[in-house]
């Protein structure tokens, strides 16, 4: 044990009735990013995930497959663990409810609650959902008797069972939730749970006799413990409640249980009431995240829209998947999964903004300084000095904003802060123009300062982005010529950390650009409208020759795209605001929406016809034209590495 503050975070333990889908990947990526962040922020972290392996559904699945339940779960749990490895999940423990350590804890706590008088024998007659492993009282159902959580038909069951006195603790639960408003998050989930309890809390069936795959009730072995009393206890088992009292003393209570919104009820009502009965401190927070949806619908096998993460990981890599999920989905809300948006995000944020910044920064260090960094001196040039001071200030401000976002469970806000800084570094290149400084030996200290600021800024980015893109972050760190990445933390993020004389190690592009065109076997299922085959393009006729004087009438400039958005009711048009330097901006409308996502254009430098007469397109005045090349139905915009306003000759 050490003196660091502790942080205990858990995912749900996933049910091995089938392969995991992208929604499970989302949940575990969130938890992993928080665990990594807390480690970098100086905490002793215990990060738990696992598998919930008992219950009637598993028993039935195993029987259908002609194997024993443990043989059935062993195979699928192995797939879980392989997925987490490929996703680069940094869990400290993986608990299985079939492990002996867990069986011992469940039986001990069941006995304790029984001895207290909070568990009694009775007969259960009512409605049961096999897939969800949940009982439903009549007052929570509609006339169709379908599961309120999953929508499947419920089974009417009648059997001897043990019951847990949930109703006894309803008032105490309500008082606790009112006095601890941060216990259930986000607030919308808290309000839902309060209304659920206000509508009436019935005692909970906590044992079954109609199947045998489960942990035996210690004083009545013909009963097995109901799966939720079994599963929820895993958080105590892994924390060492029986086997490691020092560990348990340090890490319990859990700081956060991260769960999908469909199991918030079990974690925020059943679980805390169980702990009240057992005399164990409640977790500090339960956070219920939203669902990932595809084509506007929740994923389900019956709809054929379940997204398998394995092909995506193989095609795009874990960092790209993690970044997209955590950046594009507002935590706590449902979010739509889109392959096109994933590719757009890779191209715009990871390839263009981050990857190109690192590559061109290190290329200039290699070209102008033979790969060696020196801090230099920017004081001799007012523009460079001011821009450099702004980067130093923004680095500290970004770290503060990033930490605030992560601590506030606003991961996408934290990432936006980091990528705003990345774009500021890209802008810094345009303002300071290191290629121009390199032409004048007298400006060598200025060039050194600019190159150092770019690399030191990337050092900040590397550590801040590590919770979300850990593989790329370590590559950035190593390419900057730094070592001991595993032991770095946020205390190291003080400006000036790269020592004079550091040799950079430029590598290949971090995130190669992905072409938008997709094959028919794309791993993300979606509804696709059949397109008519394209008509063969006619060979273009040669244009009439023009004089050199006519050509020079065209004023071609480099323009930086500041904003970009699709034009409403148009499939082809994107509206952009571009900068021509010296504070001059223009609005331009371009027919490139079929080939580029708006977000991947922002920050790009393009060739712009600046003296074209304005024309209205879809009611928007377009004040120029962006040049593009087309052939055989494809189109590409040439991007250039020159400052905005540069004349094209």
Segments (PLM) and residue ranges:
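Structured secondary-structure scaffolds
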Residues: 2-49, 96, 101-105, 131, ...
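A broadly conserved sequence feature marking short terminus-proximal activation segments
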Residues: 72-128
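The −1 position to Zn-ligating cysteines in a subset of zinc-ribbon hairpins
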Residues: 112, 128, 135, 146, ...
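Helix-rich, typically C-terminal accessory recognition domains appended to large enzymatic cores
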Residues: 121, 127, 328, 333, ...
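Cys/His-rich microdomains that often coordinate metals
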Residues: 136, 154
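Phosphate-backbone binding interfaces of nucleic-acid-interacting proteins
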Residues: 530-649
């Amino acid at each position: 044990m050490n003196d660091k503050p502790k942080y205990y975070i858990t995912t749900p333990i996933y049910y091995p009735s089938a392969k995991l889908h992208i929604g499970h990947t989302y949940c575990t990526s969130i938890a992993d990013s928080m665990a990594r962040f807390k480690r970098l922020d100086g905490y002793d972290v215990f990060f738990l995930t696992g598998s919930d392996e008992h219950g009637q559904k598993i028993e039935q699945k195993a029987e259908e497959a002609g194997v024993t339940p443990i043989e059935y779960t062993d195979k699928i749990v192995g797939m879980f663990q392989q997925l987490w490895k490929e996703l680069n999940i940094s869990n400290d423990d993986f608990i299985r409810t079939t492990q002996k350590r867990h069986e011992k804890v469940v039986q001990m706590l069941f006995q304790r609650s029984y001895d207290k008088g909070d568990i009694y024998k009775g007969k259960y007659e009512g409605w049961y959902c096999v897939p969800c492993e949940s009982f439903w009282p009549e007052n929570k159902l509609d006339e169709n008797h379908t599961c309120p959580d999953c929508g499947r038909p419920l089974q009417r069951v009648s059997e001897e069972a043990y019951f847990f006195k949930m109703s006894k603790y309803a008032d105490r639960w309500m008082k606790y939730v009112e006095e601890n408003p941060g216990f259930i998050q986000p607030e919308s989930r808290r309000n839902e749970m309060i209304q659920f309890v206000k509508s009436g809390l019935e005692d909970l069936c906590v044992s079954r006799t109609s199947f045998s795959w489960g942990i035996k009730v210690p004083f009545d072995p013909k009963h097995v413990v109901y799966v939720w009393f079994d599963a929820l206890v895993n958080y105590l088992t892994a924390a060492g409640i029986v086997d490691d009292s020092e560990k348990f003393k340090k890490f319990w209570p859990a700081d956060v249980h991260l769960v999908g919104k469909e199991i918030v009820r079990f974690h925020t009502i059943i679980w805390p009431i169980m702990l009240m009965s057992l005399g164990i401190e409640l977790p500090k927070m339960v956070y219920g995240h939203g669902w990932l949806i595809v084509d506007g619908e929740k994923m389900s096998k019956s709809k054929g829209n379940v997204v398998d993460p394995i092909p995506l990981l193989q095609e795009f890599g874990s960092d790209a998947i993690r970044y997209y999920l955590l950046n594009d989905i507002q935590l706590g809300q449902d979010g739509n999964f889109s392959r096109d948006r994933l590719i757009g995000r890779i191209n715009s944020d990871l390839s263009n903004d981050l990857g190109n910044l690192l590559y061109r920064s290190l290329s200039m260090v290699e070209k102008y300084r033979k790969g060696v960094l020196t801090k230099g001196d920017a004081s001799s040039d007012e523009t460079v000095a001011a821009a450099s001071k702004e980067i130093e200030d923004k680095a500290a401000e970004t770290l503060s904003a990033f930490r605030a976002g992560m601590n506030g469970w606003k991961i996408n806000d934290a990432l936006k802060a980091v990528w705003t800084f990345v774009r500021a570094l890209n802008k810094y290149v345009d303002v300071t123009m290191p290629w121009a400084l390199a032409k004048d030996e007298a400006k060598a200290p200025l060039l050194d300062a600019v190159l150092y600021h770019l690399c030191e800024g990337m050092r900040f980015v590397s550590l801040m982005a590590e919770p979300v893109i850990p593989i790329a972050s370590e590559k950035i760190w190593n390419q900057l010529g730094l070592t001991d990445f595993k032991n770095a933390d946020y205390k190291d993020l003080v400006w000036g950390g790269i020592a004079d004389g550091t040799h950079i190690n430029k590598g290949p592009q971090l995130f190669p650009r992905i072409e938008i065109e997709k094959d028919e076997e794309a791993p993300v299922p979606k509804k696709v409208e059949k397109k008519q085959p394209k008509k063969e393009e006619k060979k273009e006729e040669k244009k009439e020759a023009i004089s050199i004087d006519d050509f020079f009438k065209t004023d071609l400039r480099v323009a930086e795209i500041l904003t970009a958005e699709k034009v409403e009711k148009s499939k082809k048009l994107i509206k952009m605001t571009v900068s021509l330097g010296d504070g001059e901006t223009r609005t331009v409308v371009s027919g490139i929406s079929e080939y580029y996502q708006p977000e991947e254009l922002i920050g790009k430098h393009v060739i712009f016809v600046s003296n074209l007469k304005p024309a209205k397109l879809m009611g928007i005045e377009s004040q120029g034209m962006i040049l593009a090349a087309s052939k055989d139905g494809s189109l590409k915009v040439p991007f250039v590495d020159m400052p905005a306003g540069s004349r094209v000759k």
